[in-house]
């Protein structure tokens, strides 16, 4: 962990942004798995806000008023993720507020249920 306190003494009123790419305890995946192992969010003590990567699901955590944001991925990466709710985050550095921008996509991973070849011939296949 960088010495944020020392940097604040030296540089004063700057914004201190945490950047992190790995699982954090408490983050969830698209299938509902919650990380119990990983890094504790207390490592961001002293940051003004935190931008994360790794988990492809938009979610926000909070550490003593510090927003910790997982923006999601830009598009669905595999069958374990939903087709929608992918995008990016725009930060207002002064207010420490963010906005999640959802991106629509014409592509995705889908699962179809087909009981017989007739389902395809008669266009009766079902999106699961």
Predicted regions and their residues:
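Extended recognition/assembly regions associated with phosphoester-bond processing machinery
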Residues: 1-128
């Amino acid at each position: 962990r960088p010495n944020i306190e020392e940097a604040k003494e030296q540089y004063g009123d700057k914004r201190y942004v945490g950047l992190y790419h790995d699982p954090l305890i408490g983050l969830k995946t698209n299938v509902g798995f919650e990380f119990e192992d990983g890094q504790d969010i207390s490592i961001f003590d002293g940051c003004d806000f935190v931008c994360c990567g790794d988990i492809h699901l938009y979610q926000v955590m909070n550490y003593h008023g510090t927003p910790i944001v997982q923006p999601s991925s830009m598009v669905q990466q595999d069958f374990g993720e939903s087709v929608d709710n992918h995008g990016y985050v725009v930060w207002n550095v002064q207010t420490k507020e963010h906005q999640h921008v959802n991106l629509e996509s014409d592509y995705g991973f889908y699962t179809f249920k087909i009981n017989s070849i007739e389902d395809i011939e008669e266009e009766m296949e079902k999106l699961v």
